From Swiss-Prot:
SUPFAM superfamilies: Anticodon-binding domain of a subclass of class I aminoacyl-tRNA synthetases (SSF47323), Nucleotidylyl transferase (SSF52374), ValRS/IleRS/LeuRS editing domain (SSF50677). The gene is leuS. This is Leucine--tRNA ligase. ATP binds at residue 637. It comes from Neisseria meningitidis serogroup C (strain 053442). GO terms for biological process: leucyl-tRNA aminoacylation.
Length: 876
């Protein structure tokens, strides 16, 4: 065994050993329990970042732990390869997105392999490959035929200069990110998934997910947003019907969760696209201008929440069905046409948004809810104004004094008797629009025929292949300019037809990839029935909390869709979910001439610390001049505070990177980058290597201790007690608790006790062998390369076949224990006694201690309290 720890030599050797033995290549094996461990697959952006390293190390630790425990473990990997960044990079570098993507995949795959992850690379998939997205297209056509996928107009951000649709994040202050042109809202035909058909099941099945973080389940519940409320129809006033047709000329319909406040409505607000707004604006230029302004605004709900609320009165009126009040109709920029009825009733006295709007435009506020003796002030919003639970109705005629539920029932009865409303359950969740007017995505398998309409591409003509030799120019959809792509024959009538040139939302690919891993080369469907039956659901899923809503919700939705197609036999995709925290690092900057910030990489900064180790000042190494310390933030390119994993691996080795990531913080918490922490992790690995080296130098490996320990010295028994209690703790930390930092700390404590124990005797060397073999097995999930190498020196066999160490219960039974001695409740000494010492023996031993004799001062004991195994308290 070489004396020095050299990761650059041992890590490639260990990886070659695993690859040659193909130990991570897995197939269905009914003789073993299965364990499917999956970390969210990466977008091939070019390089791994530290967040990737943390995510995949967590998955690898769990996979290797389960492997040693006899499970048939699948840990696959692939690439979430479609998406806008590839198009942006392609335009910047004048290269096809496909070429850019495949180059990145090759480099990142090399990085993943250098970290020693126990990945079954035979299952590798890239979502941009036709053999993958073929089956996504197939499912789309099946769901289109069932009506779960449908086409309707949707609102998008249109850049009139680049002649293209922009994502919400590409609109900056109302202008296109490339052209700078003012963005318009446009209605275009788009495809939607009826996720709302599954809203109730998606909501209810959250209760089945016992091993998901409550925070994630709460976020999904709120996103689905089930509410019980009432549809209310306000009759359109006779003098306000001009230009309206059908039901729109008869009534304005709204949905409210607070019908108890209906008597307090003082106006109603409609979206700019509402027919009532259009009719009112017909002869009013100021309304037309406001409607145009609204249509130019963002279509993102998040932006709606933070933007300034604006409105204009239409001069049209509707009638409150409860009290006959005439309410003016306003056009407001905070009302969305695509959400609900595109209209809301406004109760300024009891809704904070309405209160602010009414204050801004001097509209009336009518109190109809009272809470205790609180006084209503129309000039100042107070939290109790919106209190549904504790309020009672006032200023509401014969409804006065009623609580929410009583008023709800009474108002429902009144409205239903008039045909003016009824109770309704509604969801915040909206159908999922999956059409994207971009190139680098999965083509939508629909053909548009003038004779036959929208025709799904037949299965035997799939996949509709995306041409890969295209370099986008940012001016509209490349596919819409390629007759060789869109010109085709109708599958029904054979006549000339046109392919759909939109592509699918990239959330589509990540909504089912975990099933494709089960049989990635299966050519007769999305997943083979045998593989789906064996692997079932993912046992452990790992990824960031930022995916709590959309990705995880869509994956749950797709699982139910595939179940209903008879493709899988599970209701939920992920049995257990771990959301790891971010990797964060200090940030530094200097202000530039334009008033902006030039961010400086931490490696280029020199710090000065106070006597408590806190940074007090920082200078740039290059010029010695000050930089601003800006606090700790998530590692990112924008803040220039990232650390390249490859540099870390080159300097210290993959095991050091893995150990630091697992030891620096519990997995669900943020991990703060620390150079000293990395050095500390490397020091521990050098110590582990040195410990085994010194042991072997003293006489080579021996047979590890096993069997009856009665003949061992107390010191060796204590070491074995520590060893087997460590096995129990680490097993629990890896398995149930998933707290890897405390598992590492436990092994460190074990090695500390080993260093203090004399193991020079023949029995001592056998116990030392047991301790070192076990420590290596316990650490293999986290630092597999060094452990693989040390195991071969200690044991000569294959560590991956060694199994997880078992707890020797006999070693946990102590023959002697330490008991505290107190006099009048104060600690005065300790005694070592037999573990089975009687009460009388404990009392006698305690009374004989030097501390007891001294502090009893010759007085007799009034009482002696014995807590078995812990203490003896002498009361004088």
């Amino acid at each position: 065994m070489q004396e020095q720890y050299r990761p650059a030599a041992i890590e490639p050797a260990a990886q070659k050993k695993w690859d040659d033995a193909r130990i991570f290549n897995v197939s269905e094996d009914a003789s073993k329990p299965k364990y499917y461990c999956l970390s969210m697959f990466p977008y091939p952006s070019g390089k791994l970042h530290m967040g990737h390293v943390r995510n995949y190390t967590i998955g690898d630790v769990l996979s290797r732990f389960k492997r040693l425990n006899g499970f048939n473990v699948m840990q696959p990997m692939g690439w979430d390869a479609f998406g806008m960044p590839a198009e942006n990079a392609a335009m910047k570098n004048n290269v096809a997105p496909a070429a850019w993507t495949y180059d990145n995949i090759e480099y990142m795959k090399t990085q993943l392999k250098s970290l020693g992850f126990a990945i079954d690379w035979a299952r590798e998939t890239a979502t941009c490959k036709p053999e993958y997205y073929r089956w996504e297209q197939w499912l789309f056509t099946k769901l289109f035929e069932k009506g779960i996928v449908y086409r309707k107009n949707g609102t998008v951000n249109w850049d009139p200069v680049d002649q293209t649709v922009l994502a919400n994040e590409q609109v900056i202050d109302g202008r296109g990110w490339r052209s700078g042109a003012l963005i318009e809202k446009r209605e275009i035909p788009m495809y939607y998934f009826k996720i709302t058909d599954y809203a109730e099941e998606l909501l209810n099945d959250l209760d089945k997910l016992e091993h998901w973080p409550e925070q994630v389940k709460t976020m999904q519940r709120n996103w689905i947003g089930k509410s019980r409320g009432m549809t209310v129809r306000f009759a359109v006033s006779d003098d306000s019907k001009q230009g309206l047709e059908g039901d729109y000329a008869r009534f304005l319909q709204v949905y409210t969760t607070r019908p108890d406040t209906l008597m307090g409505a003082t106006y109603v607000a409609v979206a700019a696209e509402h027919p009532l707004a259009t009719a009112a604006a017909a002869d009013k230029p100021e309304l037309q201008a406001f409607i145009a302004e609204c249509k130019a605004g963002s279509v993102a709900e998040a932006d709606m929440a933070t933007m300034e609320k604006k409105g204009v009165p239409t001069g049209r009126y509707v009638v409150n069905p409860l009290n006959g009040d005439k309410l003016e109709v306003w056009i407001a920029n905070y009302v969305l046409w695509g959400y609900g009825d595109g209209a809301v009733m406004a109760v300024p006295a009891h809704d904070e948004r309405d209160f602010e709007f009414a204050t801004k435009y001097s509209l009336p506020k009518k109190q109809v809810i009272a809470v205790g003796d609180n006084a209503f002030d129309a000039n100042q919003w107070q939290e109790w104004y919106g209190d549904k639970e504790n309020g009672v109705l006032v200023n509401s005629g014969d409804l006065d004094g009623m609580n929410f539920q009583t008023a709800f029932d009474a108002i429902a009865a009144k409205l239903q008797s008039q045909g003016a409303g009824e109770p309704k359950t509604q969801y915040r969740l909206r159908d999922w629009g999956i059409s994207r007017q971009r190139y680098w995505g999965c083509p939508i398998p629909i053909v548009h025929c003038e004779q036959c309409g929208d025709v799904p591409v037949p299965a035997d003509q799939l996949p509709v292949v995306l041409p890969e030799n295209v370099v986008p120019d940012g001016m509209g959809s490349p596919l819409a300019k390629m007759p060789e792509f869109y010109e085709t024959a109708c599958p029904c009538c054979g006549g000339a037809a046109k392919r759909e040139t939109d592509t699918m939302d990239t959330f589509m690919e990540s909504s089912w990839y975990f099933f494709r891993y089960m049989s990635p080369k299966f050519s007769d469907g999305m997943v083979s029935a045998e593989a789906a039956k064996y692997w079932g659901a993912v046992d452990q899923y790992i990824g960031g909390i930022e995916h709590a809503i959309l990705h995880l919700l869509y994956a749950r939705f797709f699982t139910k869709l595939m179940r209903d197609e008879g493709l899988v036999n599970v209701d939920e995709p992920f049995e257990r979910l771990l959301t790891q925290g971010m990797v964060v690092c200090e940030t530094y900057y200097r202000e530039n001439d334009k008033g902006g910030k030039d961010w400086i990489n931490p490696a280029d900064v020199e710090l000065t610390f106070d006597d408590k180790g806190r940074p007090v000042s920082a200078v740039l190494k290059a010029d010695g001049l000050p930089v601003v310390i800006s606090g700790t933030e998530k590692m990112s390119k924008s803040k220039n505070n990232g650390v390249d994993p490859q540099e870390l691996i080159n300097a210290y080795g993959a095991d050091t990177a893995r150990l630091f990531m697992m030891f620096a913080a519990p997995p669900e918490q943020s991990l703060e980058w620390s150079d000293s922490g990395v050095e500390g992790a490397h020091r521990f690995l050098r110590r582990l290597w040195r410990t085994v080296y010194e042991y072997l130098k003293q006489g080579g490996a021996v047979k590890a201790f096993a069997g009856n320990q009665d003949g061992l010295s107390k010191e060796l028994k204590d070491l074995r007690h520590k060893l087997h209690s460590t096995i129990a703790k680490v097993s629990d930390d890896y398995g149930r608790r998933q707290q890897f930092n405390t598992a590492i700390a436990a092994v460190m404590e074990l090695l500390n006790q080993y260093d203090k124990t004399d193991t020079g005797s023949e029995q001592g060397r056998a116990v030392a062998q047991e301790v070192l073999e076990t420590a290596v097995r316990l650490l293999w999930p986290i630092v597999p390369h060094i452990c693989e190498t040390l195991w071969s020196e200690l044991n000569g066999a294959k560590l991956w076949e060694a199994g997880w160490p078992a707890v020797d219960e006999a070693a946990l039974v102590k023959s002697e224990i330490e008991v505290m001695v107190q006099v009048n409740g104060k600690l005065r000494g300790k005694i070592t006694v037999a573990a089975d010492a009687s009460k009388a023996d404990l009392e006698a031993a305690a009374l004989a201690t030097e501390g007891a004799v001294k502090f009893m001062e010759g007085k007799p004991a009034k009482k002696i309290i014995v807590v078995p195994g812990r203490l003896v308290n002498i009361v004088v």
